[in-house]
Regions:
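An N-terminal, well-structured beta->alpha segment
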Residues: 1-2
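Glycine-rich phosphate-binding loops that contact phosphosugars or nucleotide phosphates
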Residues: 6-137
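Short, solvent-exposed beta-strand edge segments and adjacent coil->beta transition regions
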Residues: 167-170
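Internal, active-site/partner-interface "lid" segment
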Residues: 94, 108, 135-165
Length: 181
């Protein structure tokens, strides 16, 4: 909440999808945020990550090779890194200004290898972080409508006063007027 710039998320694979979701959630309540895919970063997209921004990198292993160029870019420009991993000795956490160490969990399923439990835990962590940020910035329904005017949520938040025509904008005709004219 003290970030002077944008909150940028990155991650590869399932971690990237969680980062994209977390970014979308933050944007929906007014925190400027977006997702940069790590494979696009070394091809020009790293230019969207600026000195005042905060870069949140998510990687269960913390050693995902595709993230190295993003870490290097952040280090080169003095961009703060918040690293989220389940590996205390990871490259990611070694290069992070703020370290989020999530517990290692056993993946459910027949192989025990498909990211299921770990992705659920990571998504839950970032949803809880979003709720804490909403509380810190005193987020309310009246602020939510400013960023989320569409869909079912937007319809639920709109008031009649926001959508009804008023005053001389009302299409009024005299009751004696001919309908065909």
């Amino acid at each position: 909440a003290n970030c002077k710039g944008k909150v940028i998320f990155t991650g590869q694979g399932k971690s990237g999808k969680i980062g994209a979701s977390a970014s979308s959630t933050m944007s929906s309540f007014g925190i400027p945020s977006f997702f940069v895919h790590p494979s696009d970063a070394p091809h020009g997209d790293s230019g969207s990550i600026q000195r005042k921004d905060v870069l949140i990198i998510i990687s269960y292993s913390g050693n995902t090779p595709e993230l190295q160029s993003v870490i290097s870019h952040a280090n080169r420009f003095g961009i703060k890194i918040i690293g989220c991993s389940s590996n205390k000795a990871s490259t990611l956490l070694k290069h992070s200004d703020v370290k989020i160490l999530l517990p290692k969990v056993r993946e459910v399923g027949p192989t025990g290898m498909v990211p299921t439990s770990s992705t659920t835990l990571t998504l839950l962590y970032f949803n809880c972080l979003a709720v804490a940020l909403m509380d810190k910035i005193k987020f309310s329904k009246s602020k939510f409508i400013l960023f989320h005017s569409g869909g079912s949520i937007g319809k639920e938040l709109l008031t009649c006063g926001q959508i009804c025509l008023k005053g001389n904008k009302l299409p009024l005709i005299n009751y004696k007027s001919n309908i065909l004219k």
